[in-house]
Amino acid sequence: MKALHFGAGNIGRGFIGKLLADAGAQLTFADVNQPLLDELNKRKSYQVNVVGEQARVEEVKNVSAVNSGSPEVVELIAQADMVTTAVGPQILARIAGTVAQGLVTRHQQGNTRPLNIIACENMVRGTSQLKQQVFAALPESEQAWVEQHVGFVDSAVDRIVPPSEAGSTDILAVTVETFSEWIVDGTQFKGQPPQIAGMELTDNLMAFVERKLFTLNTGHAITAYLGQLAGHQTIRDAILDPAVRQTVKGAMEESGAVLIKRYAFDPLKHAAYIEKILSRFENPYLHDDVERVGRQPLRKLSAGDRLIKPLLGTLEYQLPHNNLVTGIAAAMSYRSEQDPQAQELVELLAKLGPKATLAQISGLPADSEVVEQAVSVYNAMQDKLAH
């Protein structure tokens, strides 16, 4: 199996790329970080530190790398059996043109073997969004052929992969937690789905996408935002603070009540899933900084993301949401000199005030009860910081 993976960052190397290589794929990474690409091509392998109760080092072998902007990428798409991405939602749109070129070349070469493309991003139905962007870049005459021979497979991915430790001398080494989950929509493949250990097929992907978004992502973000307010440096320090933990767990239970109602999840199993996630946040081997996890607050406060989407579910089913609201207020309080969205958030708050800012970012009606509630919690947080 020939596989091309866009994004040779920590998630690409430590999660998706690793599973593909472990499955025996002939794997090429595409990225723009030239020193990283040179090192991958020189060594053809790298090390993954899997940390948890039993830490171990696993070697990923037989890999190569190309620059995402090079003609080689187009040729690789024309020949691949599988294309995956872990580039972040913002960059996904930028690779659509390259993917479209590769598909046109594939058609010209008469390659009718099925190709499956899977975007492994923190977004809902990311591959379907990529497909729209690819089709916008395709000549109309090519679209029917692509529709027939290329599967765009949506997925849900979950593995905590913090940035490399400062002072680490090996630019290829990556640290990951033991837990990983890669769930793909089995109904969207062209041809037989490939056998890859660690990739699970489902015919009910949205349940898994929302379970992960409403639990792991919601919990992780709120831990970061409340952790920063309480003066904690890492996710572990924050989640071990009883006050933070109580709100985070409460928020995950509130979003969980939406999932139980919407997808008929087993309440006991979902409670166990929440406990599992809390224990992952406590992992002493993952030094995950609250400022990093809180990055991009405008995106995280948007209507389809980890804070507002579960809140909208509680409104739809008339369920409690006090802890989610506290999390939203904490997100509005996030500050970072390094993050452009944090800077923009501060400017919006100064210009519009909290009520209009939250309404603008989230799409919630400014005069709604829930916005009033979030603003009141936010103001109380700001008063506390001022004293």
Swiss-Prot record:
Disulfide bonds: none
First-tier enzyme category under EC: oxidoreductase
One GO term describing the cellular component: cytosol
Enzyme Commission (EC) number: 1.1.1.17
Catalyzed reaction equations: D-mannitol 1-phosphate + NAD(+) = beta-D-fructose 6-phosphate + NADH + H(+)
A GO molecular function held by the record: mannitol-1-phosphate 5-dehydrogenase activity
InterPro entries assigned to the protein according to its UniProt record, in alphabetical order: 6-PGluconate_DH-like_C_sf (IPR008927), 6PGD_dom2 (IPR013328), Mannitol_1_phos_5_DH (IPR023028), Mannitol_DH (IPR000669), Mannitol_DH_C (IPR013118), Mannitol_DH_CS (IPR023027), Mannitol_DH_N (IPR013131), NAD(P)-bd_dom_sf (IPR036291)
Pfam families: Mannitol_dh (PF01232), Mannitol_dh_C (PF08125)
Keywords: NAD, Oxidoreductase
GO process annotations (BP): mannitol catabolic process
Keyword check for NAD: yes
Binding residues annotated for NAD(+), in chain numbering: A3, L4, H5, F6, G7, A8, G9, N10, I11, G12, R13, G14
Keyword Nucleotide-binding assigned: no
Family of the protein in this entry: Belongs to the mannitol dehydrogenase family.
NCBIfam families with a match to the protein in the record: PRK02318.1-2 (NF002646), PRK02318.1-3 (NF002647), PRK02318.2-2 (NF002650), PRK02318.2-5 (NF002652)
Official protein name in the record: Mannitol-1-phosphate 5-dehydrogenase
Source organism phylogeny: Bacteria, Pseudomonadati, Pseudomonadota, Gammaproteobacteria, Enterobacterales
